[in-house]
């Protein structure tokens, strides 16, 4: 079936059709939503409905109607699918007149509660002070008004292109003649590959043509050999060359480069190299570079001349159609005209040949056969027939089919019966299939207009009613008893019998018997009562067929005209569905019908897979089994069945090896799976589509193909991202089948019918058609000619995205100020195009630089750009524990972003202590994800340095841009600036969340905000309770997903209204954005709409501040004016920083930031939001050698002495010097400063001259930064001060006797065990403060706390009454009184398995918040117990 050009019809149905949608297995998977029943209908209907709805969504129609011939179950299916796609569906009418309409949502329908903002006195004071000192200037005001004319685009373009020297590009090099290839152990293997036979033909065709398509089956050798053919030919003929070969996956680029280098007996980085996002191994000698599509694209952004020295570009695996490959081909096609010597080779296993021939203009195609053995194919009907698989539902359906057959027999007797010859026998209750009313199949609140019982309600009727109705219908038909109609109408009107009631023995309805007997007035009566003219009897006849068969011409005319009026204007999609029914035998058709009525095939039938697997293992030869599943949940579910739940397998685990393949899984399976198993052991591989092309397992003989894949797609109409389970393409199905014939003939079991296969897409939907295009639209402006609109350039793509999606993406870029009205990139836009993250995350990072809270935002942005580090637990029982882990990391801050940040920081601490793997398992985190995030931070920070946002020294250095990193309110302001327009508002009256386009939004179950802080069982109305618990009326979110018809938001944070007012909306507000109370009125709301005069009066006194079409605030006139001016100061500061990132900050700039921070902090406190500690801590020291893909951060030389320690992404040599310099005054936690707890002499005086410490081996402070060890400057030097802006650390010190503590208090010294020394020294260096809390073992008390004031030396004290203690260090005692343990019973330490703080070993570190709370307990001691020292 051909795909409509605009969009894939393969959008899933949440209960069927084209893919298991969000409802059964929403993002992250797991079970159907509560209250949703499976909807089981024929495949033909599912496919037709999907096509119709997709065409409607992307077309210009506002409304669409479906025919009344649909059954209630089919209507239910359409309701659920429509709702999951963000459409509004309604059923109207009764009986035969019941039809369904689908409408597009109108954003204007969204009602919302009033948006207000009440400022505290301190906030007003802070803004007034700023404005009085530095008023908004005319220049600032003018710059922030909407532009009225276009600037000199050519000048700006040239300047900005020069400015944006992006990282991650391929190096410039000149073509050279390759060296001769070396002989290797792989030579004989190379010569056995199918592609080897065509070497001369391939080289010749490439020489003669600019573009060549090569289609070769997986395993034919095209990826590794074709680039080598070109190198060898150039060596042989003395021709210089330089080749780029792109791969869609990073791992593939590395693996192929390493393999090719090995085949040529070279080291990687010589003739053969690779470059991916975080790593490169290339040199000036490199002539063949393997890279990702994204890397080549970024190279092209530097200008068309970047390919002037390249001779060949090979784009491999083109069939994957990721957005970068399609985009790349668009640009390369243009460049072929400019570079006459450039050759382009497209290579793939399943290329859409005709599409690319058309696109590149009749270029030659080379086909390379693989060497697989024959693979037998079995579709669903074949599997059901040969294995005899059945289940309870299938048996039930078959029983009901027998009942239907009996009805047909009785019907036939009716048709042939003579009048008066048939006497009705005893009527029995009918037991036909009970299909629930369409609205029972939906979740709460279908469209509620449906009150009539459906035609399937006979089971609900009492036996006497069934008997009476059967008797009446029999009399009408057999005796032509017209008077019986009076009783039928009476029962329909008074006893709630359906007008479409079916005779229990024949399935005939009143309309059918009236039509067959020619009772015209009764037919009209029944139609007016809502009878369904499309209802069919058990033999498939409708009322019209009865009338035709029995020659009732008047009735035929009546029914035909009525049917025509019903169907007028409705879409007839049946012609689009290639039913091809003649291919199916009656037996197969029945088997499929029974199966589809028993199981919703939009999910994956694990029962059927287990049945198949058992059959293979007990009746087939040896050979590995490869099972293709859509995602993580299905893989784990099936694995658990095999290993634990199914006794047929669980009792024989020694006979199987189960492997799991998934791109995100923490598993070494991907290497182990390639090895052959021991004799007598069968390998069972559970895999996603990663095993289609990326990983080849040679001993696979059996493939079980679920036919499903999980695809992330962006709905540009509703701005929602959906993770959908969808049907694979035919090309993928063929690839999967080919995996079975690698070593000998195999079998491929397909869990879908031939009909489904025939209606699959030929090829996968290009990513360009299903992903957000903002990033590509930015790139388009750098790749396309200056005056070329984005849409025009993207229209040149092999399959252009729908204009609507491009329009929406461009609009989003305008919304976030990356583009102006004329689609020209703004100053911000040029910087965003340079950053290797999505535009909104890039904006977040740039705002963080200006707000000086970079570090936490770097971590959060990279996490959002990559993926959630929290993994789904393997065991279902652990899912609750996983949620609690996530919640614990939020520290009560009402923020999922906080959980991401603190999880990363805690992982880094665990890593520095050497137990990161156990930490990840315990906290359900992905180690690999964390490591990638570190690499992404490195790259992002490198780009910020290159652009001048982070300087090497002085103002704007790494310390300066982290001045406010410890202030969570400021960090959230940067989040808000980046997340806009992803906002929701709390409607307190109705306890619902509303968005710009959504009346009702819910928290995704994975969000910590979805679970209010209840210690016992959560309340039944969880969402309402969660909303009620929110401290503010505003939330930001990262992603909106749709599970069924409800929009869910995930990764949310509660924020204050003032943050929204200052950081959301466009920088350039219209001059009338602020309306004073006198001129303000609410459009469209009559004056009498208010409930009381008082309310009218109150509202009338408020000013209105309109930030965009949705954000309309009503607030006091003074507050509105102050906030508008604060906005203007912020946006003009941000604009100045974008124009000149390296320029020193002015007095105005500094004052503006100080005022903003004061406002944010005050309002945060006023809202009751907590300020967790430790969020600004810099990344801990970490050896880059331990990280994957890290060589781009490593020095090519070996590491030198500690004085030359290599610093991380975050520390330049210059900064290292700064770190040794005297520290500014340290800032203790405000609470202690106010209470006078801390030593009054604490400051710089006692430390400013202390400049170095003893040299430490570099291995103790491995790379990326944060805590270098400066070299020693001589013996006996004092310790320098700890680093400012670093977190406070807390440790428990256990003493074996009280005497040691008395000595410590007298002399101000302490010693600990050698095992604790390194940990404390490191903490002393990394932190602004280290507190030690003392407890004598067995005393039941804490005996006070001190702060550490020097590093631990080598000198030992003879005073201690304990053996085994190490060197002495200085401490300053702050509190010396005893605190009973019962005071601290409520404090649990997350860093010690959530044990109570008193249950700590010597040297146990406390989580910062817990430590802070513990120290505060001394303030609560009764007065008589206090004994504070100076």
Swiss-Prot record:
Motif DEAH box covers 316-319
Q: Which domain of life is it from?
A: Eukaryota
Spans of the ANK repeats are 506-538, 539-571
Specify residue ranges for compositional bias: Polar residues: 1164-1174
The family database entries (Gene3D superfamilies) matched by this protein are listed as: 1.20.120.1080, Ankyrin repeat-containing domain, P-loop containing nucleotide triphosphate hydrolases, ph1033 like domains, R3H-like domain
Question: What's a single GO BP term from this record?
Answer: germline cell cycle switching, mitotic to meiotic cell cycle
Q: Which residues form the Helicase ATP-binding domain?
A: 203-369
Q: Report the EC number(s), separated by commas if there are several.
A: 3.6.4.13
| Cellular location(s) | Cytoplasm; Cytoplasm, Perinuclear region
Alphabetized CDD domains for the sequence: DEXHc_YTHDC2, R3H_DEXH_helicase, SF2_C_RHA, YTH
User: SMART domains given for it?
Assistant: DEXDc, HA2, HELICc, R3H
Instruction: Provide the GO MF annotations for this entry.
Output: 3'-5' RNA helicase activity; ATP binding; ATP hydrolysis activity; N6-methyladenosine-containing RNA reader activity; RNA binding
Quote the record's binding site residues for ATP.
216-223
User: Which reaction(s) does the protein catalyse, per the Swiss-Prot or TrEMBL entry?
Assistant: ATP + H2O = ADP + phosphate + H(+)
Bias (Gly residues) ranges? 14-33
Q: Does the keyword Ribonucleoprotein apply?
A: no
Q: Where is the R3H domain?
A: 38-106
Q: Where does RNA bind?
A: 1294-1296, 1310, 1360
Could you tell me where the Basic and acidic residues compositional bias lies?
1231-1249
Extent of Low complexity compositional bias = 1191-1200, 1250-1264
Task: Kindly report, in one word, the top-level EC class recorded for this enzyme.
Answer: hydrolase
Residues annotated with Phosphoserine modification: 1089-1090, 1092, 1202, 1263, 1267, 1281
| Domain comment quoted from the record | The YTH domain mediates RNA-binding. It recognizes and binds N6-methyladenosine (m6A)-containing RNAs.
Q: How does it assemble?
A: Interacts with MEIOC; binds transcripts that regulate the mitotic cell cycle inhibiting progression into metaphase, thereby allowing meiotic prophase to proceed normally. Interacts (via ANK repeats) with XRN1. Interacts with ZCCHC4. Associates with the small ribosomal subunit. Interacts with RBM46.
Query: What is the name of this protein?
Result: 3'-5' RNA helicase YTHDC2
Q: Which organism is it from?
A: Pongo abelii (Sumatran orangutan)
Q: Which classification does the entry list for the species?
A: Eukaryota, Metazoa, Chordata, Craniata, Vertebrata
Gene that this sequence comes from: YTHDC2
């Amino acid at each position: 079936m051909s795909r409509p050009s605009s969009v894939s019809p393969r959008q899933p149905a949440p209960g069927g059709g084209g893919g298991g949608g969000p409802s059964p297995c929403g993002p992250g998977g797991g079970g159907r939503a509560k209250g949703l029943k499976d909807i089981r209908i024929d495949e033909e209907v599912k496919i037709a409905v999907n096509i119709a709805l997709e065409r409607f969504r992307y077309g210009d129609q506002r409304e669409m109607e479906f025919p009344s011939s649909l059954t209630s179950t089919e209507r239910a299916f359409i309701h659920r699918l429509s709702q999951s796609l963000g459409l509004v569906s309604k059923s109207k009418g009764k009986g035969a007149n019941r039809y369904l309409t689908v409408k597009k949502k109108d954003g204007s329908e969204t009602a919302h509660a009033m948006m207000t903002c009440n400022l505290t006195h301190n906030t007003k004071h802070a803004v007034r002070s700023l404005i009085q000192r530095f008023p908004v200037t005319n220049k600032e005001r003018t710059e922030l008004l909407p532009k009225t004319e276009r600037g000199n685009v050519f000048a700006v373009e040239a300047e900005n292109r020069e400015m944006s020297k992006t990282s991650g590009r391929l190096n410039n090099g000149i073509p050279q003649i390759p060296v001769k290839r070396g002989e290797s152990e792989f030579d004989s293997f190379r010569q056995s590959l199918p592609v080897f036979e065509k070497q001369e033909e391939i080289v010749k065709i490439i020489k003669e043509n600019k573009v060549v398509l090569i289609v070769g089956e997986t395993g034919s050798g095209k990826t590794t050999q074709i680039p080598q053919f070109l190198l060898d030919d150039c060596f042989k003929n003395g021709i210089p060359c330089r080749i780029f070969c792109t791969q869609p996956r990073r791992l593939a680029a590395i693996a192929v480069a390493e393999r090719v280098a090995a085949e040529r007996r070279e080291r990687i980085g010589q003739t053969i190299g690779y470059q991916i996002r975080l790593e490169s191994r290339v040199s000036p000698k490199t002539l063949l570079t393997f890279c990702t599509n994204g890397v080549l694209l970024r190279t092209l952004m530097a200008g068309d001349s970047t390919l002037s020295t390249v001779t060949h570009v090979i784009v491999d695996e083109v069939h994957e159609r990721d957005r970068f490959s399609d985009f790349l081909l668009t640009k390369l096609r243009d460049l072929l005209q400019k570079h006459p010597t450039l050759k382009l080779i497209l290579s793939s296993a399943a290329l859409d040949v005709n599409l690319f021939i058309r696109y590149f203009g009749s270029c030659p195609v080379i086909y390379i056969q693989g060497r697989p053995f024959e693979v037998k194919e079995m579709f669903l009907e074949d599997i059901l027939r040969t294995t005899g698989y059945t289940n309870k539902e299938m048996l039930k359906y078959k029983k009901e089919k027998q009942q239907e057959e009996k009805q047909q027999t009785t019907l036939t007797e009716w048709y042939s019966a003579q009048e008066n010859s048939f006497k009705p026998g005893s009527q029995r209750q009918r037991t036909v299939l009970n299909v629930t009313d369409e609205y029972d199949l939906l979740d709460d609140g279908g469209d509620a207009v449906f009150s009539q019982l459906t035609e399937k309600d006979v089971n609900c009727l009492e036996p006497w009613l069934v008997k009476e109705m059967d008797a009446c219908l029999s009399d009408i038909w057999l005796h032509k008893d017209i008077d019986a109609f009076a009783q039928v109408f009476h029962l329909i009107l008074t006893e709630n019998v359906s007008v479409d009631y079916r005779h229990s023995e024949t399935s005939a309805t009143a309309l059918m018997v009236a039509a067959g007997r020619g009772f015209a007035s009764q037919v009209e009566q029944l139609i007016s009562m809502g009878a369904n003219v499309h209802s069919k009897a058990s033999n498939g006849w409708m009322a019209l067929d009865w009338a035709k068969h029995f020659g009732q011409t008047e009735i035929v005319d009546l029914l035909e005209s009525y049917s025509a009026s019903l169907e007028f204007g409705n879409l007839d999609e049946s012609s689009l569905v290639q039913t091809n029914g003649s291919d199916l035998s009656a037996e197969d058709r029945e088997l499929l019908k029974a199966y589809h009525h028993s199981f919703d095939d939009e999910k994956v039938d694990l029962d059927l897979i287990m049945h198949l697997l058992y059959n293979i293992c007990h009746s087939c030869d040896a050979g590995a089994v490869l099972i293709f599943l859509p995602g993580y949940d299905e893989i784990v579910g099936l694995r658990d069945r095999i290993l634990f739940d199914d006794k047929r397998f669980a009792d024989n685990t020694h006979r199987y090896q189960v492997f799991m393949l998934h791109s995100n899984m923490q598993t070494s399976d991907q290497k182990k799976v390639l090895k052959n198993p021991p004799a007598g052991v069968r390998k069972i591989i559970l895999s996603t589509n990663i095993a289609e092309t990326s990983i080849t397992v040679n001993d696979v003989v059996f493939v079980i193909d679920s036919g499903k894949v999980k695809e992330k797609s962006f709905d540009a109409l509703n701005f929602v991202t959906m993770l959908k389970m969808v049907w694979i393409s035919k090309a993928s199905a063929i690839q999967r089948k080919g995996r079975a014939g690698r070593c000998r003939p195999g079998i491929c079991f397909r869990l879908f019918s031939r009909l489904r296969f025939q209606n699959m897409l030929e090829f996968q939907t290009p990513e360009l058609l299903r992903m957000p295009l903002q990033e590509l639209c930015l790139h388009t402006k750098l790749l396309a000619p200056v005056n070329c609109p984005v849409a025009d350039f993207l229209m040149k793509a092999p399959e252009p995205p729908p204009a609507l999606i491009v329009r929406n993406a461009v609009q989003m870029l305008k919304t976030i100020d990356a583009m102006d009205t004329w689609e020209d990139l703004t100053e911000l836009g040029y910087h965003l195009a340079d950053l290797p993250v999505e535009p909104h995350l890039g904006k977040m990072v740039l705002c963080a630089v200006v707000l000086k809270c970079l570090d936490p935002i770097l971590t959060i942005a990279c996490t959002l750009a990559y993926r959630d580090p929290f993994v789904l637990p393997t065991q279902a029982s652990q899912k609750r524990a996983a949620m609690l882990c996530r919640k614990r990391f939020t520290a009560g801050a009402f923020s999922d972003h906080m959980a991401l940040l603190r999880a990363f920081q805690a992982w880094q601490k665990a890593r520095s202590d050497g137990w990161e793997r156990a930490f990840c398992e315990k906290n359900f985190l992905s180690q690999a994800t964390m490591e990638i995030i570190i690499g992404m931070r490195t790259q992002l920070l490198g780009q910020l340095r290159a652009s001048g946002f982070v300087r090497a020294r002085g103002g704007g250095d790494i310390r300066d841009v982290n001045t406010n990193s410890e202030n969570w309110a400021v960090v959230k302001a940067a989040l808000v600036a980046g997340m806009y327009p992803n906002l929701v508002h709390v409607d307190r009256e109705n306890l619902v969340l509303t968005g710009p386009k959504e009346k009702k939004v819910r928290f995704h179950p994975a969000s910590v905000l979805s679970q209010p802080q209840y210690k016992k069982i959560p309340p039944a109305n969880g969402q309402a309770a969660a909303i009620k618990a929110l401290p503010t009326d505003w939330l930001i979110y990262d992603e909106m997903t749709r599970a069924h018809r409800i929009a869910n938001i995930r990764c949310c944070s509660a924020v204050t209204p003032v943050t929204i007012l200052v950081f959301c909306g466009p920088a350039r507000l219209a001059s009338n954005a602020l309306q004073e109370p006198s001129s303000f009125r609410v459009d469209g709301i009559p004056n009498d709409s208010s409930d009381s005069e008082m309310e009218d009066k109150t509202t009338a006194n408020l000013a209105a501040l309109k930030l965009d079409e949705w954000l309309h605030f009503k607030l006091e006139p003074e507050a509105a004016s102050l906030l508008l001016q604060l906005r203007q100061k912020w946006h003009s500061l941000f604009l100045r920083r974008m124009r000149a990132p390296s320029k020193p900050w002015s007095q105005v700039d500094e004052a503006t930031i100080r005022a903003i921070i004061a406002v944010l902090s005050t309002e945060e406190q006023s809202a009751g939001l907590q300020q967790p500690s430790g969020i600004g801590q810099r990344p801990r020291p970490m050896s880059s050698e331990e990280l994957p893909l890290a060589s781009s951060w490593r020095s090519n030389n070996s590491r030198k002495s500690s004085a030359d320690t290599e610093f991380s992404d975050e520390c330049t040599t210059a900064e290292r010097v700064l770190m040794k310099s005297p520290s500014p005054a340290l800032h203790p936690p405000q609470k202690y400063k106010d209470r006078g707890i801390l030593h009054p002499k604490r400051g710089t005086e006692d430390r400013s001259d202390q400049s170095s410490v003893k040299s430490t081996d570099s291995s103790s402070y491995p790379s990326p930064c944060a805590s270098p060890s400066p070299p020693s400057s001589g013996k006996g030097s004092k310790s320098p001060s700890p680093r400012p802006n670093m977190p406070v650390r807390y440790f428990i010190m256990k003493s074996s006797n009280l005497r040691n503590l008395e000595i410590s208090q007298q002399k101000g010294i302490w010693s600990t065990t050698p095992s604790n020394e390194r940990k404390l020294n490191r903490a002393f260096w990394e932190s602004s403060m280290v507190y030690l809390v003392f407890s004598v073992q067995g005393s039941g008390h804490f005996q006070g706390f001190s702060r550490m004031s020097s590093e631990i030396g080598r000198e030992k004290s003879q005073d201690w009454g304990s053996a085994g203690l190490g060197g002495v260090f200085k401490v300053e005692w702050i509190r010396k009184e005893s605190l009973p343990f019962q005071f601290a019973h409520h404090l649990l330490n997350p860093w010690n398995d959530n044990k109570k703080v008193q249950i700590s070993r010597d040297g146990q570190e406390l989580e910062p918040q817990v430590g802070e709370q513990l120290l505060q307990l001394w303030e609560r001691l009764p007065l008589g117990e206090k004994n504070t020292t100076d």
